[in-house]
Amino acid sequence: LLSGDWRRYLRLGSRSAYAIRAFGFYSGGDRPRRVNIGGTLGLRGYPEFGYIVGTRAYMLNQEIRFPVLTHLTLGSPLGDVDFPEIQAGFFGDIGKAVLHQDSERALLGSWGISFRLALGPFAVLRLDLGRRFSDGNFRGYSLDRSQRDPGFVHFFFGYNY
């Protein structure tokens, strides 16, 4: 079993950053393990569990993150309500998962825009609007027709990569 997950964050300005993540996985032998690379922390716009699976996989995520709304305060009779900063990001993801016996699977990817609201130091509320792309060869991925449509909207609660 070989697995690697490399991440780098480069500051572009005082409030913006470029985030990149590279992931690779290989498992061989009589009973190789499988890895899933779909979902919000992998290939955005593709299913989270059981569809983009393989004993060999690689993935690249890239994102440019920047603030959209830095301060929002709403007044009420009970006092002001301060909201945290709203950030946006342009993203691009690409990857492939291959089972040992099936090497003809497509290279999958997605691109789009993401909006996020930090909920404390570790949690984030995120909305992704994007487009899927591939070479059209979905054989072996078990994706239904709606999961092959180009456009997607996805809501996520969790953490950033």
Feature-to-residue mapping (PLM):
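C-terminal outer-membrane beta-barrel translocator/porin domains of Gram-negative envelope proteins
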Residues: L1-F90, V98-H100, F138-R148, F155-Y161
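Short basic (Lys/Arg) and small-residue
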Residues: D93
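C-terminal beta-signal and terminal closure region of outer-membrane beta-barrel proteins
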Residues: D102-Y161
